[in-house]
Amino acid sequence: MLKRTEKHIARKNNLSIFYIQTEDLPGQIGTIGCIFGKHNITIRNIEFINEKKDEEVLIKFAVKMPSDMSKEKIMDELQRVNGVKKVTGQ
């Protein structure tokens, strides 16, 4: 969960937050980044939150999205990436 200050900063900077639980695969960050890039979404921050197992990792992405972009559409596309277990957003 974001701390109160982080939530304020995200809102002030018009950032969206995505949490992605994924298998720890070579190139996985690049694959996710390509999806964001394809939709003109700029990654502002990446944070590795938790490694539950050696094979999985929870990654928090803070991104700047175009105003007409549907967050649900991006979440659906990210969910289809090989190795991604769960995608949530704030």
What does each of the following model-derived ranges do?
Residues 1-48:
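Canonical alpha-helical transmembrane segment with a positive-inside/aromatic-interface signature
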Residues 15-16, 58, 67:
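General secondary-structure edge motif
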Residues 18-20, 60-63:
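Short cationic amphipathic helices and targeting signals
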Residues 25, 64-69:
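Helix N-cap motif at beta-to-alpha junctions
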Residues 31-36, 70-83:
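Short amphipathic alpha-helices in soluble, non-transmembrane regions
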Residues 44-47, 80-90:
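Conserved short beta-strand edge segments in small beta-sheet-based binding/regulatory domains
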Residues 52-59:
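A short, glycine/Asx- and small/polar-enriched loop/turn
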Residues 63-64, 74:
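Long, continuous compositionally biased terminal/linker segments
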